[in-house]
């Protein structure tokens, strides 16, 4: 029988970022209770030797599975050190990989309070609304002018510790373009 290869997208992440993310997930599962229904699988519960952990996040009748890996081939930089993360959306027998931004949006659909567009309508009708969004990572678009105006009136409350963002977990903090000052010293430009 010949070898069968399965190719997966694995985001290279440094070890400390993975540790921080796991810690945030466990805190919100066991202490704050904001991640009710999430399931954390340790490395010793997995039959695969390269899997460091898995977090299963129920999304209705589907689920999001964030798997962290160790012992992979090192990346192009010394600090990659063979650590990585894959993000998978599963429903029954179907599964597909998703990017970190979409994962954060899916999580936000089901978890964490949000001051959303519906809050504007509720406020006009005199109903009590949640005055802030607890999970800013789930928003990657600019809101309506009404939403921005109402959101500007209410200062967001800082949540300690922050909620676990998949985008934050997979972002490349070393290869971001360096910001330099413009001609007058006040404007910023991205590497130009």
UniProtKB/Swiss-Prot annotation:
Gene Ontology cellular-component annotations = host cell cytoplasm; host cell plasma membrane; plasma membrane; virion component
Where is the stretch described as Disordered?
164-192
Where is the stretch described as Interaction with host APOBEC3G?
Answer: 40-44
Q: What induces it?
A: Expressed late during infection in a Rev-dependent manner.
Give the motif span (HCCH motif): 108-139
Where mainly located?
Answer: host cell
Q: Which residues carry this modification: Phosphoserine?
A: 144, 165
For the modification Phosphothreonine, the affected residues are 96, 155, 188
Which residues are involved in binding Zn(2+)?
A: 108, 114, 133, 139
Write out the PTM section of this UniProt entry: Highly phosphorylated on serine and threonine residues. Thr-96 and Ser-165 are phosphorylated by the mitogen activated kinase MAP4K1. As the HIV-1 replication can be activated by stress and mitogens, these phosphorylations could be involved in this process. Ser-144 phosphorylation may inhibit elongin BC complex binding. Processed in virion by the viral protease.
**InterPro entries in the cross-refs:** Vif
The protein's location, in the record's own words, is: Host cytoplasm; Host cell membrane; Virion
Q: Where is this region: Multimerization?
A: 151-164
Query: Residue ranges for motif BC-box-like motif?
Result: 144-153
List every stretch annotated RNA-binding: 75-114
Composition bias (Basic residues) maps to 176-186
The GO terms describing molecular function are: identical protein binding; lipid binding; metal ion binding; protein-macromolecule adaptor activity; RNA binding; ubiquitin-like ligase-substrate adaptor activity
Q: What does this protein do?
A: Counteracts the innate antiviral activity of host APOBEC3F and APOBEC3G by promoting their ubiquitination and degradation. Acts as a substrate recognition component of an E3 ubiquitin-protein ligase complex: mechanistically, Vif hijacks a host cullin-5-RING E3 ubiquitin-protein ligase complex (ECS complex) and the transcription coactivator CBFB/CBF-beta to form an active E3 ubiquitin-protein ligase complex that targets APOBEC3G and APOBEC3F for polyubiquitination, leading to their degradation by the proteasome.
- What's in the domain note? The BC-like-box motif mediates the interaction with elongin BC complex. The HCCH motif (H-x(5)-C-x(18)-C-x(5)-H) mediates the interaction with CUL5.
Listed under subunit, the entry gives: Homomultimer; in vitro and presumably in vivo. Interacts with viral RNA and Pr55Gag precursor; these interactions mediate Vif incorporation into the virion. Interacts with the viral reverse transcriptase. Forms cullin-5-RING E3 ubiquitin-protein ligase complex (ECS complex) by interacting with host CUL5, RBX2, elongin BC complex (ELOB and ELOC) and CBFB/CBF-beta. Within the ECS complex, Vif interacts directly with host CUL5, ELOC and APOBEC (APOBEC3F and APOBEC3G) substrates.
Query: Any remaining note in the record?
Result: Vif-defective viruses show catastrophic failure in reverse transcription due to APOBEC-induced mutations that initiate a DNA base repair pathway and compromise the structural integrity of the ssDNA. In the absence of Vif, the virion is morphologically abnormal. HIV-1 lineages are divided in three main groups, M (for Major), O (for Outlier), and N (for New, or Non-M, Non-O). The vast majority of strains found worldwide belong to the group M. Group O seems to be endemic to and largely confined to Cameroon and neighboring countries in West Central Africa, where these viruses represent a small minority of HIV-1 strains. The group N is represented by a limited number of isolates from Cameroonian persons. The group M is further subdivided in 9 clades or subtypes (A to D, F to H, J and K).
| Family in the record | Belongs to the primate lentivirus group Vif protein family.
This chain belongs to the protein called Virion infectivity factor
Gene that codes for this? vif
